Every structure is written in structure tokens, then in C-alpha cells.
Amino acid sequence: LRQQRYDMVLNLADQWPRAVISKLTGAATRIGFDFPKRRHPVWRYCHTALASTQQHNQLHTVQQNLSILAPLGLQLNDAPARMGYSEADWAASRALLPEDFREHYIVIQPTSRWFFKCWREDRMSALINALSAEGYAVVLTSGPDAREKKMVDTIIAGCPQARLHSLAGQLTLRQLAAVIDHARLFIGVDSVPMHMAAALGTPLVALFGPSKLTFWRPWQAKGEVIWAGDFGPLPDPDAINTNTDERYLDLIPTDAVIARSE
């Protein structure tokens, strides 16, 4: 890193090794955050300036990260997020779609790395059946993880008559971006593809459970966020066992998602 002769380092992390690495780069400007738990001379020594975190508990994660620019006199609280992909990405993903799916389809990503963020499979099946009855084609996506693909298979089994096609585990992130960008609507849970849809400007319906909604809701999204906390009590996000079998999104009624998706 020192050999790259960086002019500036922006350290968004709160870990000690990141601060030390920032110092070791030799960059003339090294900005970090003034985390209360890091108010120590060594933390200050590793950086040339520290940005305030005083308002972070009220800000979206994007705004928190952008606030590191404050020592430079820059205020970019509403900067748009964007995601790109190549024509080759779209060509590759388009070739995987049936001919009659290549326009006006809905993408549904029912999975997340953490299953406590997922909606029950039979409810996803009911949603797909309702959309299919209205004439919509649905593309199902997921990551390559075996558990995610098994979830998708279970959902498909509940939709024997639906106009449905699965690309679960078959796409790179940029190919997935191309598929989402050409969709009429994205429906998904609190996961990376939801944020991709927001960055691509695709209308979305996002299902949220016990995540910190202020921090992690889709940034500047077109569409709606359905929060499980509006339908019943949720645990504190910081107290969740991420390996739990609990499906906290099950508080969200199927009809509420169908109504916002049609």
C-alpha cells in the first residue's frame, strides 16, 4: 500500500488494524471516524482528521459513510447510488430467460444469507400464484448456496401453474443487476439484490424484519418497504441469534405484499 503512494485514505471502519494500516500507507491525509469507543491517542495518531459520529444513529448507512467527507468541507448527504453492468452481462442473462419472459417480468429474490430475514416459502408461493393469475411472469433468483436453492425449489413446488422461471444460483452479481434493471418490479427481502434494485432505479417492494430500518432501508428507492414491525413485535436487532430458525418476516400478511405488488 505504501508503494502506491496514496494521497488520501478514508477509513470507514472502527477496527484497530484498519487504523494502523491507514497510518502505514504514508498518505498525507488520513480521515477516520471519531467513534466514542476509539477515543484514544493511538487512534488519533493514526489519522490526520476525525469526522463526527454524533448523528450516526439517526442516519442511513450511506449518509453515515458520506459524513467522513466533512473534514474536507464536503456535504453529500443525498448523493445517489448507482450500479453498472456491461452489455455482455445483459446478453448472457437474457439468453437464460424464456423468449416470452424477456420483457415485463417481475424479479423475486426470496433468499438471504441469513434465513431469519426470509419470508416463509408458502407465502412466497402464494404471492407468485397471485401475480401469475394477474398475468405477470416471475423470475426467481438466489445465491449459489445450497440452502438458498432448496428454498427456491420449495417455493416453485407451490406454484405448479404459475408463469415462472428460476435463475437461482446461475448469475454473477452483474448479470443479476442486468436482470433486475430490465424488470418491471423487484420483490425481495433485506439482502444485497434489494440494494442493487434501489441503485438501478427498478421499482421495488422490500420486506424487512428485525434489521435497523433507519440504517439499512433501500437508499432512495422507488417503491415501498413493508416492515414486519408494523404487524407485531420484533426483537432488538442487536440481540438476534443469526443462526436462529425463526422467520421474523412471517408477521407480514400475504395480502399486504400482494396489494403492494400488483
What annotation goes with each model-predicted range?
Residues L1-E262:
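Catalytic machinery of carbohydrate-active enzymes
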